[in-house]
Amino acid sequence: MNVLNRRQALQRALLNGKNKQDAYHPFPWYESMRKDAPVSFDEENQVWSVFLYDDVKKVVGDKELFSSCMPQQTSSIGNSIINMDPPKHTKIRSVVNKAFTPRVMKQWEPRIQEITDELIQKFQGRSEFDLVHDFSYPLPVIVISELLGVPSAHMEQFKAWSDLLVSTPKDKSEEAEKAFLEERDKCEEELAAFFAGIIEEKRNKPEQDIISILVEAEETGEKLSGEELIPFCTLLLVAGNETTTNLISNAMYSILETPGVYEELRSHPELMPQAVEEALRFRAPAPVLRRIAKRDTEIGGHLIKEGDMVLAFVASANRDEAKFDRPHMFDIRRHPNPHIAFGHGIHFCLGAPLARLEANIALTSLISAFPHMECVSITPIENSVIYGLKSFRVKM
């Protein structure tokens, strides 16, 4: 199967799963798959799907058995660190880690708090607002823009780019797939050109931002090339926008949905880190990851052959009854909480500390600012690779 056909097969397999589930409440489908077909094979598209915690963790984390490297066409995000195997992954990761140390993240905490407070002030006098549009979307976009060292004036364009890069075709028709790939390729060309210009500026005039750190960072005497930096910047833009936006929205929805939790967090803000971890488990922003088998291996009594494509449903694993007590309950005091919402192994999410920091500040500040809040309405994102809300209206 060639590169394009592999990409299309994965998209079709994801759409097959999406069509069997409610956009924001896929959990009954996950539960039925864990019970009836924990390792299933899509004959039409030649793609495996795994749903149990131990199986998902193995597929996602075992670098000897499963590869993240899928040959891409001209794709900046496709050529980023998430789609690399060692030794190239090791080299890139060791360099970019320098931009995400606890010390670097700690330096950004006051600014993230400042941005959060400024956003809350804009809607503090209203009786109702859209939590996504007014808060959980702009906050991560502004933060990641400043972290990368690019003007936040590009915020709307950033959102358009990142939305497109995580989108999927409207349906399984050849026309829809062709139009989707053409639009996505155009988007990636625009992003690559944009970041190439920013990187050149930082080489000539470095500042206190992540791109400058990466431009200056050296590993065994080598600096990262533009070809290595551009995909990583694209990945940061997309992950920094989509994942954190959906984490904040999903967390607040879960908090409001569960009686007494909002009031408990208002009285005990020290519980917020645990609440964020539980939100990651309960409503994972990235519900599915994909891998390719590097050699023949057995999972759940099924032979997965070398070269087979596998979809690992992280959101299902995080609700596996064999791993979590009362998995369908949102419990902010859950301990331990070994969720795998940020992945596992060498591809554990590099931006996890930033996402956690933003979510903790955002949710604590929101709950502190409003003595009462309730959900008015939600509109889910119709997408098979990300999980979140397009709109989330709340009233105070």
UniProtKB/Swiss-Prot annotation:
Record GO terms (molecular function): heme binding; iron ion binding; monooxygenase activity; oxidoreductase activity, acting on paired donors, with incorporation or reduction of molecular oxygen
Record EC number: 1.14.-.-
Enzyme class: oxidoreductase
Keywords, in A-Z order: Heme, Iron, Metal-binding, Monooxygenase, Oxidoreductase
Keyword field contains Protein transport: no
Keyword Coiled coil: no
Tree of life domain: Bacteria
Cofactor: heme
Protein name as catalogued: Putative cytochrome P450 YjiB
Origin species: Bacillus subtilis (strain 168)
Gene name of this polypeptide: yjiB
